[in-house]
Amino acid sequence: MGKKKGKGAVGLIALVCEETGIRNYTTTKNRRNTQEKLELMKYCPSLRKHTLHKEGKIK
């Protein structure tokens, strides 16, 4: 038996670079505790500097 694929409390999200639009990182987020979108300063390998990464959908 497999797991159900529904909208649970913890979801998998992608972090998208604001300058390039590339999905560089994936992480999990508890949707009940943090309802707003994540915004983190992360390293972008294509630009070779730290840029703002925002939460996006995983395709």
UniProtKB/Swiss-Prot annotation:
Entries under Gene3D superfamilies matching the protein: Ribosomal protein L33 (2.20.28.120)
SUPFAM superfamilies with a match to the protein in the record: Zn-binding ribosomal proteins
GO molecular function: structural constituent of ribosome
GO CC, alphabetical: cytoplasm; ribonucleoprotein complex; ribosome
A UniProt-annotated Pfam family: Ribosomal_L33
InterPro entries cross-referenced by the UniProt entry: Ribosomal_bL33 (IPR001705), Ribosomal_bL33_CS (IPR018264), Ribosomal_bL33_sf (IPR038584), Ribosomal_zn-bd (IPR011332)
BP-aspect Gene Ontology terms: translation
NCBIfam families to which the protein is assigned, alphabetical: PRK00504.1, PRK00595.1, rpmG_bact
Name of the featured protein: Large ribosomal subunit protein bL33
Native source species: Borrelia duttonii (strain Ly)
Name of the gene encoding the protein in the UniProt record: rpmG
